Swiss-Prot record:
A Pfam entry, by short name: Sulfate_transp
BP GO terms, sorted: chloride transmembrane transport; sulfate transmembrane transport
Topology of this chain in the membrane: Multi-pass membrane protein
Parts of the chain on the Cytoplasmic side: 1-131, 185-188, 243-244, 327-350, 421-443, 505-532, 581-893
GO molecular function: secondary active sulfate transmembrane transporter activity; sulfate transmembrane transporter activity
Compartment annotation: Membrane
The protein's name: Sulfate permease 2
Domain STAS: 676-854
Keyword Transmembrane helix assigned: yes
Domain of life: Eukaryota
Transmembrane segments: 132-152, 164-184, 189-209, 222-242, 245-265, 306-326, 351-371, 400-420, 444-464, 484-504, 533-551, 560-580
Gene responsible for this protein: SUL2
Length: 893
């Protein structure tokens, strides 16, 4: 039985060898024939081949003094750029140095000008205060007073959430509003007590108080809250001054929305007992689900306070609906023809909605005064706020009790995260809406300084409020200076209205809290958008809410933070590396989009891949183009062309020039290209691989495995393992198992070999070991256009990959790199011998080097717009580094 010889590879004829009878050929003979095959192949590799020539310049093969053949590709049409003798000017590319990095990225920040710029950035008010005018003042005054009217009742309500007396909420409000004006980069954010931070403060007070079972008189709730503000302020300011605000970006928006929704749900149910009048019967510091259960159990214990809670809550929602939705809709419907009246009613609705909290509290405070005046605490039918000290009490340097800071340590990370994330998320959101830039580092400084100054007034932690910031933006505030007017309103209330605050019903404050906090609950549209944008974000959001509700707010915060970091690491550790194929694409401008979806195949196409419309004649103003649809029907279409005059008085024809684009093979899934387009594989012996993330120690092993598996799958060995002695084969790749001679002579083995069923059940190999038609790997092109950085571990993995592939291919495989965007990545690659041929890893006699350079053309000026200067785009000393993926189909491989 005769057997055919080796496959025809690179037009090399391999002598056939015959096998007679059924005996196994001698290994020495096979090795001799294989050596002859390799010699013929190598000799043919260095022979110059005839190259075709056409209107576009083709390759010019040049044999170097070392015997390495280089081929040069002309990427420009000769009508555009003329390259003499297909040559490029020499350009020696150097590697980046530490001095260059210092000059480029560091030097400018260490100068006197840089120091002045830094100091100026700490006080943004310096940039806009000289331009302050009366129009800005009027807008800021109106917005500031409006926010002040909202801030007073809200700050007292949130102090109740924090289990603190009402005056501490007022202290935090006025000092936060004052100090933020001088450090802010957002004109809309309002600093003060907020719901989530107040809840966290209450948790901290409860935890720290539990650590003092004997009841130290110096460790009170206000002292713990002020100490927490001190520590949060120091850390926030330090992070801002050191410009480490990017750390806040590690937690994603969906994670922030998750724990804010869970916290809002916690606050809402925590205020229901006070709303109904049985607050002392329910432990509102327990897990949320327990609070819900206990609240429902004690519904029969409802008191008269429910009247002062449920009615205000109902009125607040009706008020919001009428003034925010239905009233403006009626105004637009019936007053659109009277612009002046329409504007008056519009602003009336707006300010009525903004003042709803204050008006409700004033009304029910009057009722509370009427029914509780002159009665003792036990005789009062409802719970009222009680005594609120007038003015600023105990102003001065705050002294921290010994040992208190260490007790706060375990609660500090969660508190800082709540303090920073909510504020940064709010400020950046309004910055996008109102078209101004928010500097996160400076915002951290503003929060830190505000809380540090607050310790002189016994304030508790304050940060940005979403509801007040939204109201401030709707008031058309112009500068952060409006905070001065808001703070003045709070200060005025502290000195003039504390007597009236005594009669505020606690149930009414709970109604205000529930009404304000309900806006923090994520709507079903937000939840559904998370699912549509990314299911993983949806899962993070839901799980964070559940953990916050069924465990604690701290656990929800830590889970959200860990989830965000885990997703970041997993995306880097498991990159979506892709092997690429090629397709010819072209840009068609001002094209007519046909309503049908048939695929068009142009019949008239020249040799350069340029499709043109067929000219119907010199006098004919219409030219016809034939195309073929996917239903195999020829359709003739008349395309009207614009009659631009040309020197030959002929109609200019549209030209579509195609170029090679490299696309992943799984483009049907990635939607990078029309799924009906067939991706052509690279030429034989070429693999193109795109890395989708930075090439680091986290993912280098995965890339190594993906590439080696693909190499072994689509290419054959340089030295077939069947033609090697068994003793020379590696233990981890010994080849197919063959039965020993004594086993083949046994009767049952012969019967097994002749049994059709056993042949069907025998393991099959994807490649015929007798005849392997797969090509030899010659070029591995790595697309580094998305690789921002690399490290020593990854570079060593790349060296190991080169060694393994060279050993598999039995030759030096060329490693080409495309689109390197970092000079440090290029420096690392060069240090490990990449960028050109490396004779250290293989015998030069089996290397066929291919050189390809990109050139760039630059117009010489307006005087000679048709003349260009041509430069070499990449270093000629590094021929394996490219700006774009070469068109390997044009290479002489």
């Amino acid at each position: 039985m005769s057997r055919e010889g080796y496959p025809n590879f690179e037009e090399v004829e391999i002598p056939d060898f015959q096998e007679t009878n059924n005996t196994v050929p001698d290994l020495d003979d096979l090795e001799l024939e294989y050596d002859q095959y390799k010699n013929n192949e190598n000799n043919d590799t260095f022979n110059d081949k005839d190259l075709e020539s056409n209107s576009v310049a083709k390759h010019n093969a040049v044999n170097s003094s070392k015997g390495v053949k280089g081929s040069k590709i002309d990427y420009f049409n000769p009508s555009d750029v003329s390259l003499y003798d297909n040559s490029v000017s020499q350009f020696e590319e150097t590697t980046v140095s530490l001095k260059e990095y210092y000059d480029h990225s560091i030097r400018s920040h260490l100068t006197v000008k840089g120091a002045c710029s830094y100091l100026k950035s700490v006080f943004p008010i310096i940039n806009w205060l000289p331009h302050y005018n009366f129009s800005w003042f009027t807008a800021d005054l109106i917005a500031g007073i409006t926010i002040g009217c909202v801030l007073v009742p809200q700050s007292m309500s949130y102090a109740q959430v924090a289990t603190l007396p009402a005056q501490y909420g007022l202290y935090s409000s006025f000092i936060g509003a004052y100090s933020y004006s001088f450090f802010a980069t957002s004109k809309d954010v309002c600093i003060g007590p907020v719901a989530v931070m107040s809840l966290q403060t209450a948790k901290v007070i409860a935890d720290v108080t539990a650590k003092y079972p004997d009841g130290d008189s110096a460790i009170t709730g206000p002292v713990i809250a002020t100490t927490l503000a001190l520590l949060c302020g120091i850390i926030s300011a330090a992070v801002g001054f050191l410009r480490l605000g990017f750390l806040v970006e590690l937690i994603s928006l969906n994670a922030v929305a998750g724990f804010m929704t869970g916290s809002a749900f916690n606050i809402l149910w925590g205020q229901v007992p006070a709303l109904m009048g049985y607050n002392s019967l329910v432990n509102t510091r327990a897990a949320t689900y327990k609070v819900v259960i206990e609240t429902l159990k004690h519904l029969p214990d409802t008191k008269l306070d429910a009247v002062f809670g449920l009615i205000p809550l109902f009125l607040l929602y009706v008020w919001k609906w009428w003034c925010g939705t239905y009233g403006p809709r009626l105004n637009d419907r019936y007053n659109s023809k009277n612009p002046r009246l329409h504007k008056i009613i519009k602003w009336t609705y707006f300010y009525a909605q903004a003042s709803r909290n204050g008006i409700i509290i004033i009304v029910f405070t009057c009722i509370g005064w009427a029914i509780t005046r002159g009665k003792s605490k036990s005789e009062r039918p409802i719970s009222i706020l009680g005594s609120v000290p007038s003015g600023l009490k105990e102003v001065g340097v705050f002294h921290v009790p010994p040992g208190l800071m260490s007790k706060l340590g375990p609660n500090l990370p969660a508190s800082i995260i709540v303090l920073l994330l909510e504020h940064i998320a709010i400020s950046k959101s309004f910055g996008r809406i109102n078209d101004y830039k928010v500097v996160p580092d400076q915002e951290l400084i503003a929060i830190g300084v505000s809380n540090l100054l607050g310790t002189f007034f016994n304030a508790y932690p304050a940060t940005g409020s979403f509801s007040r910031s939204a109201l401030k933006a709707k008031c058309n505030v112009r500068t952060p200076l409006s905070g001065l007017f808001s703070g003045s309103c709070v200060l005025l209330a502290l000195y003039c209205l504390t007597g009236a605050f005594f009669y505020i019903p606690k149930a009414t404050l709970s109604a205000v809290i529930i009404h304000a906090v309900s806006d923090l609950l994520a709507s079903y549209q937000t939840t559904w958008n998370f699912w549509k944008m990314n299911p993983l974000d949806f899962i993070c959001f839901i799980v964070t809410v559940l953990i916050t509700v069924f465990a604690s707010i701290e656990d929800g915060i830590y889970f959200a933070m860990c989830w965000s970091c885990a997703m970041l690491i997993l995306k880097v550790a498991f990159p979506a590396g892709k092997f690429l194929g090629r397709v010819e694409v072209a840009e068609v401008t001002d094209a007519y989009v046909r309503p049908d979806s048939d695929v068009v195949s142009y019949v008239s196409e020249n040799n350069n891949g340029i499709s043109t419309l067929e000219d119907g004649g010199e006098d004919d103003k219409e030219s016809s183009t034939k195309y073929v649809t996917n239903s195999s029907k020829k359709i003739e279409t008349n395309v009207q062309t614009k009659g631009f005059d040309s020197p030959s008085s002929s109609i200019s024809q549209p030209r579509i020039k195609y170029h090679t684009k490299w696309i992943p093979f799984d483009h049907k899934y990635t939607r990078e290209l029309n799924p009906d387009v067939q991706i052509l594989p690279p030429p034989d012996g070429v693999l193109v691989y795109r890395l989708s993330e930075s090439y680091t120690y986290l993912n280098c092993s995965r890339h190594y495995n993906i590439i080696t598996e693909e190499v072994k799958k689509v290419t054959r060995r340089g030295q077939l393992i069947r033609h090697r002695k068994k003793s020379d084969r590696p233990w981890n790749d010994p080849g197919p198992w063959e039965a020993p001679a004594f086993l083949k002579n046994l009767k049952f083995w012969k019967k097994r070999e002749n049994d059709p069923e056993s042949m069907e059940n025998a393991p099959s190999t994807s490649v015929d070991v007798e005849r392997d038609d797969r090509p030899l790997l010659k070029i591995l092109c790595l697309d580094f256009s998305q690789v921002a950085q690399t490290d020593a571990t990854a570079l060593q993995s790349l060296v190991d990959l080169r060694k393994a592939i060279n050993q598999y291919a039995d030759r030096q495989v060329e490693f080409h790199f495309v689109g390197i965007i970092s000079p440090w990545v290029k420096r690392g690659l060069i240090s490990r011998g990449f960028g050109t041929l490396n004779e250290e890893y293989s015998d030069e006699s089996i290397v066929a080097g291919h050189t390809s350079y990109h050139v760039a053309r630059v117009p010489q000026g307006e005087e000679n717009p048709e003349k260009y200067s041509v430069y070499t785009a990449s270093g000629t000393n590094l021929p394996f580094f490219h700006i774009d993926i070469p068109d390997f189909a044009k290479w002489d491989i």
